[in-house]
């Protein structure tokens, strides 16, 4: 497994150093001091990424001369989510009280969409720094009115969880596919692809199929083959996304 770009840990405000050092150890990123906008001039950091800790909200930025918007976990208002998205269509027939697992949490966008229409969903994310950003996003969400209380987050490898628990629905987004062009990926997805090892969670599909009581939903790009070559019971496809539904 190879990592294409590195992620360095910085802190935003001078009075946050002690807290920042603690967090950098907690999420296993190399502590590199106070964030500066000219870090792109240093070969060590140039064209990599900076995780910038802030007590109010942490985020990630590419370390480059060009200024870009921060990458963070931010959820839209759940009232803006259509009831007829393809993801929600893939859940048709599932009870609102069903137990649901997002086994590949990432930045939580899909889990949030599911939680907008279902009573609860457990999100599992195994990468500490991704989990930290997602935790902050859920924290800020809980402070808003009309809170979605059904989001549960754990720092854990989902295969370990599924060794002991089963769910009605298990959702998988194996986004580590290198066949797609960079331009087809959003900034947050590109960050994950570039800063995490190449890995195919093929075994996770097999575990999920054994553990799901109702269905497994796999998110794919329409150009990609079925995961493990396993044909689903049916698929729901748009221009950029295909949901493969495996009834269990």
Give each language-model segment a name.
Residues 1-99, 116, 124-169:
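S-adenosyl-L-methionine
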Residues 97, 167-170, 213:
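Local beta-strand N-terminus motif with an aromatic residue
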Residues 99, 119-122, 214-215:
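Residues at the starts of beta-strands that form the adenosine-phosphate
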Residues 103:
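Conserved beta-strand/loop positions that form the S-adenosyl-L-methionine
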Residues 107-119:
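Conserved SAM-binding loop of SAM-dependent methyltransferases across substrates and taxa
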Residues 174-204:
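Mobile active-site "lid"/loop adjacent to the S-adenosyl-L-methionine
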Residues 201-247:
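Conserved Class I SAM-dependent methyltransferase catalytic core
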């Amino acid at each position: 497994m190879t990592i294409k770009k590195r992620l360095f840990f910085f802190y935003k405000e001078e009075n946050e150093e002690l807290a920042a050092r603690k967090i950098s150890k907690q999420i296993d990123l190399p502590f590199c001091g106070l964030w500066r906008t000219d870090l792109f001039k240093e070969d060590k950091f140039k064209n990599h990424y900076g995780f910038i800790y802030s007590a109010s909200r942490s985020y990630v930025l590419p370390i480059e001369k060009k200024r870009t918007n921060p990458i963070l976990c931010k959820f839209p208002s759940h009232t803006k989510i259509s009831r007829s998205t393809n993801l929600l269509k893939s859940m048709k027939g599932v009870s609102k009280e069903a137990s649901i697992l997002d086994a590949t949490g990432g930045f939580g966008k899909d889990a949030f969409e599911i939680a907008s229409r279902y009573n609860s969903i457990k999100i599992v994310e195994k990468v500490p720094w991704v989990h930290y950003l997602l935790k902050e996003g859920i924290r800020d969400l809980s402070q808003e009115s009309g809170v979605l209380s059904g989001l549960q987050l754990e720092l854990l490898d989902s295969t370990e969880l599924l060794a002991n628990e089963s769910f009605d629905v298990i959702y998988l987004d194996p986004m580590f596919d290198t066949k797609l062009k960079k331009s087809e990926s959003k900034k947050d997805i590109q960050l994950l692809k570039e800063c995490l090892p190449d890995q195919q969670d093929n075994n996770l599909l097999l575990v999920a199929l054994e553990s799901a009581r109702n269905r497994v939903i796999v998110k794919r790009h329409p150009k990609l083959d079925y995961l493990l070559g396993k044909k689903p019971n049916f698929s729901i496809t748009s221009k950029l996304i295909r949901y493969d539904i495996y009834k269990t």
